C-alpha cells in the first residue's frame, strides 16, 4: 500500500500538471496577430468586428492577417460577443416585443489606449457606458481612424462625446452617416472608380479595379455633397445586378464610397480619418479594395512614404466569407467562439 505522503505528492503533481491545460481553455476573447518585419514593425492596429449583416467577424481577421503577415503590423481583432462570450452577429439592435433587450459588449476595448490605429466595423451598437467612454477616449486622442461599411452608423446608443458642450455625432467624426441605400439593397453591386482629380493621392497608389457585391450607400441628401473637409477618393456606380460584369444603372448617379478627412478633437488635435462604405466580407475578396484599405492604413499613420503599388495584399490562407444579410439560418450564421475565426 502506498505511503500516505506518496499519495499526497501524487495529487499535487496531477493538479500542477493539469493547471496549465485547464487554463489554456480560457484564452482571451480577442485575436492577436503578431507583427514582424516590414514597414509596420512596432506599430499596433486594433480592428473592431461588431456588425450583424456584412460579416465583419470574417473580414477583420482576414485583414489583420494581411496587415501582420505582409506589412509587419501587430494586429488585435476585438469582437462583439453575447453573454456566453461567443461572437454573435445575430444579436438584435432594437428591442423586440416580449423579449429582454441586451446591451452589446466588446471585450478588450481597453486596448484602444495603446493602439496606433483603430479600424471600426460596428453597426448600431448599444454598448455599456464604460465601453462607450473607452471609444470616446480614443477618437478624441488625435490618433487615426478608419471606418468600414456600416462603421458610419456604428452606434445606436450615442457616444458620450461633447466638444464645447455640444454633443458630437459619430457621423461627424467619419464624414457622414448612413442615409439609405442608393439603389436596391441585396440586388445591386458596386463598381468603384478612383476620382480623377485625386489619382496621385497616396491612398490610390496601385488601385484600379474595385468591385463589390454590396450596394452603394447614400450619406448625404440628393443634390448635396460630402460634408466640408471631406475629399472623395472613389466613386461608387450602382450596377444592375450582383455580378462584376453587370451594366451600370443609368438612372443612378455614382456617389462617393471612399473619402478622407481630418477630425479636430476637443483639444484641437488633428486626426486622420478614412471611410469606405464598401467593405463587406465578400467585397474584400476584391484585391483592389484590399489595396485601397491597406494604403489607407499607411496614410492614416502618416506612413505614406512606405506605400508602393506592389506591396502584397494577398489573402493569407483561405478566406470564404458568407454572404451578407439577416437570414441567419439560411446563411449558416450561428454564435461561435472567438477561436473559430482565427
Please report, for each region that a protein language model flagged, where it lies by residue.
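Hydrophobic h-region of N-terminal signal peptides that target proteins for export
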Residues: 13-24
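Extracellular ligand-binding/catalytic regions of CAZymes and related secreted enzymes
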Residues: 24-40, 58-59, 69-70, 81, ...
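Active-site rim elements
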Residues: 50-53, 186-192, 204, 208, ...
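An acidic, glycine-rich "communication" segment
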Residues: 41-42, 148-245, 309-342
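Helical hinge/lid and interdomain linker segments adjacent to catalytic or ligand-binding clefts
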Residues: 31-33, 46-48, 52-154
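Sec-dependent signal peptide recognition
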Residues: 3-14
Amino acid at each position: 500500500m502506498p505511503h500516505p505522503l506518496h499519495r499526497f505528492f501524487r495529487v499535487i503533481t496531477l493538479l500542477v500538471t493539469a493547471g496549465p491545460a485547464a487554463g489554456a481553455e480560457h484564452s482571451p476573447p480577442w485575436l492577436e496577430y503578431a507583427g514582424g518585419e516590414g514597414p509596420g514593425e512596432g506599430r499596433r492596429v486594433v480592428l473592431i468586428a461588431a456588425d450583424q449583416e456584412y460579416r465583419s467577424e470574417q473580414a477583420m481577421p482576414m485583414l489583420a492577417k494581411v496587415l501582420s503577415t505582409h506589412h509587419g503590423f501587430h494586429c488585435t481583432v476585438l469582437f462583439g460577443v453575447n453573454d456566453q462570450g461567443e461572437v454573435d452577429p445575430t444579436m438584435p439592435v432594437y428591442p423586440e416585443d416580449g423579449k429582454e433587450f441586451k446591451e452589446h459588449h466588446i471585450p478588450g476595448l481597453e486596448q484602444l489606449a495603446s493602439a496606433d490605429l483603430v479600424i471600426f466595423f460596428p453597426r448600431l451598437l448599444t454598448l455599456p457606458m464604460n465601453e462607450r467612454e473607452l471609444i470616446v477616449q480614443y477618437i478624441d486622442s488625435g490618433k487615426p481612424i478608419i471606418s468600414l461599411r456600416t462603421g458610419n452608423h456604428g452606434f445606436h446608443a450615442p457616444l458620450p462625446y461633447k466638444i464645447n458642450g455640444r454633443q458630437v455625432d459619430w457621423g461627424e467624426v467619419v464624414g457622414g452617416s448612413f442615409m439609405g441605400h442608393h439603389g436596391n439593397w441585396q440586388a445591386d453591386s458596386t463598381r468603384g472608380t478612383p476620382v480623377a482629380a485625386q489619382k496621385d493621392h497616396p491612398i490610390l497608389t496601385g488601385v484600379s479595379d474595385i468591385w463589390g457585391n454590396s450596394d452603394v450607400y447614400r450619406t448625404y441628401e440628393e443634390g448635396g455633397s460630402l460634408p466640408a473637409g471631406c475629399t472623395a477618393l472613389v466613386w461608387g456606380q450602382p450596377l444592375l445586378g450582383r455580378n462584376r460584369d453587370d451594366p451600370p444603372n443609368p438612372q443612378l448617379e455614382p456617389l462617393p464610397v471612399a473619402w478622407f478627412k481630418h477630425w479636430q478633437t476637443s483639444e484641437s488635435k488633428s486626426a486622420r480619418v478614412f471611410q469606405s462604405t464598401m467593405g463587406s466580407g465578400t467585397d474584400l475578396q476584391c484585391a483592389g479594395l484590399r489595396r485601397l484599405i491597406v494604403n489607407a492604413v499607411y496614410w492614416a499613420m502618416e506612413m505614406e512614404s512606405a506605400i508602393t503599388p506592389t506591396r502584397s495584399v494577398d489573402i493569407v490562407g483561405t478566406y470564404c466569407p458568407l454572404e451578407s444579410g439577416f437570414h441567419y439560418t439560411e446563411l449558416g450564421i450561428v454564435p461561435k467562439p472567438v477561436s473559430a475565426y482565427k
